[in-house]
Amino acid sequence: MGAEYDFAATPGFEEGGSEYYSVAGAERMRDVLPGFDSGTTLIGILGQPFKCPPAPFEGALLLHDHLVERGIRADAEIRVIGPMAAPVPITKEVSQSILDALHERGVEYVPKQRVVELDPHSKEARLESGGTVSYDLFVGIPVHRVPAVVESSGLAVDGWVPVDHTNLTTRFPDVYALGDVAGVPIAKAGVFAEAAAAVVADDIGARLRGGVLQRPYEGAGSCYIEFGRGMVGKVEANFLGGPAPTARLVGPSRELAAEKEAFASTRRARWFGS
């Protein structure tokens, strides 16, 4: 079932903010952007964890390109604000590459700050620390939560479903939790859910044969990062396969942009038959 968005968790967000995490939100933002001609766009990460950790920064880089194409970049300020100390906390290398790309384009990153409320009338964002930040266009990464049916089932503890990291079993017999609902310390992204599904299938098969899972879940996978200007990078991460999470960045390059397109096409065909 994945994670759902709790827009109401941030007062004022539904009335005074935009978002591109949902299809409906992306369509509304498409209609809002042409009306933004100058001022400050504030991209706020409203809670953790959230899907696709690079996405807020991808949004900033792509917005930069959009404003350049319209010839109004000099009239606009782009700021990203979030509770993390770095864009991708598990890896200094990837974080620094993102920070360098933001700096090169004049995008400000404000770490260790979280927006907790918007005032749509004064266009001010209130921070958890007590301060405020003014904006002309607010784009939020909404608070995530498990679906209501998972919450009411009793599976969730402290917001997510606790599991055995090796095979993704829950504390209930014969019940697994995989993907975004699972309380494992990995990024919430489809590639990790796909890998988790394979482990769960292997574990069920092994149990039916009277054996044990031969290869535990490692939380390993690759995800792509849009750097703008037609360039794409790829992060290869392993969250659970060693003593500490690891990640490295390949690219960015135009070749990886083509690879990303091929990856998406393959998954659409596999999952949706198109």
What is each of the regions a protein language model found here?
Residues 4-37, 132-198, 202-206:
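FAD-site-proximal beta/loop scaffold in flavoenzymes
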Residues 24-76:
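Rossmann-like NAD(P)H-binding beta-loop-alpha module
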Residues 43-44, 77-84, 219-227:
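Extended hydrophobic secondary-structure segments that form protein cores and membrane-embedded regions
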Residues 49-50, 54-72, 161, 169-176, ...:
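Active-site substrate-recognition segment that forms the wall
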Residues 51, 184-185, 211:
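Short, solvent-exposed loop/turn segments at secondary-structure junctions
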Residues 65-159, 212:
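A Rossmann-like FAD-binding core segment of flavoenzymes
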Residues 205-249:
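Active-site-proximal substrate-binding core of FAD-dependent oxidoreductases
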Residues 234-274:
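C-terminal auxiliary extensions adjacent to catalytic cores
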